């Protein structure tokens, strides 16, 4: 992967904390939902309820598509990422604790709220590993996309 593109991807991942992730429902229809995420390099983590539709969908098929972007008043300032990726349940307790710590770092305001953080036993934590990343940057031209295979 080109180092300039890698830096751009990491910058976009680091400056955002919400993504839209699409999983496949049992009937074959995609289901897109918004989730908070944290990343360590190109690896993303998110959590959901253990009995959620996302968790059930991913238990059947670990393929996901996701987008990370933001609203902008100028069309030519649109930037973002879309990915084809695999999402696996984090089963290692050390990695699960790390993922929860990373998520808390994305939401520092949460520390002042007197609600307990969920434990790995309370939620399903997923590790998202990108296979293909599309880097959208309209400042390089309308609809400009750099495609990266991981």
What does each of the following model-derived ranges do?
Residues 1-18, 146-147:
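Extreme N-terminal tail/first-helix region
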Residues 3, 47-49, 109-110:
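Short gly/ser/thr-rich secondary-structure transition/capping motifs
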Residues 13-14, 59-60, 104:
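Alpha-helix boundary recognition
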Residues 15-20, 107-110:
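Short Pro/Gly-enriched beta-strand edge/turn motifs at strand-loop
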Residues 17-50, 58, 65-70, 78-80:
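Short beta-strand segments
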Residues 19, 44, 64, 87-88, ...:
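Short beta-strand segments in beta-sandwich/barrel cores
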Residues 75-150:
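Charged, gly/pro-rich active-site loop segments
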């Amino acid at each position: 992967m080109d180092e300039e593109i890698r830096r751009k991807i990491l910058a976009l991942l680091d400056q955002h904390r919400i993504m839209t992730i699409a999983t496949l429902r049992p009937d074959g229809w995609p289901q897109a939902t918004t989730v908070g995420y944290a990343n360590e390099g190109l690896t993303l983590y998110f959590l959901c309820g253990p009995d959620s539709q996302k968790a059930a969908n991913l238990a059947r098929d670990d393929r996901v598509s996701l987008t990370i972007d933001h609203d902008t008043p100028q069309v030519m300032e649109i930037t973002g990422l879309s990915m084809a990726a695999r999402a696996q349940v984090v089963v290692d307790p050390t990695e699960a604790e790390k993922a929860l710590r990373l998520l808390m770092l994305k939401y520092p305001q949460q520390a002042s709220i007197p609600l307990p953080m969920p434990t790995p036993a309370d939620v399903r934590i997923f590790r998202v590993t990108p296979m293909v990343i599309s880097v959208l940057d309209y400042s390089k031209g309308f609809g400009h996309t750099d495609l990266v295979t991981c």
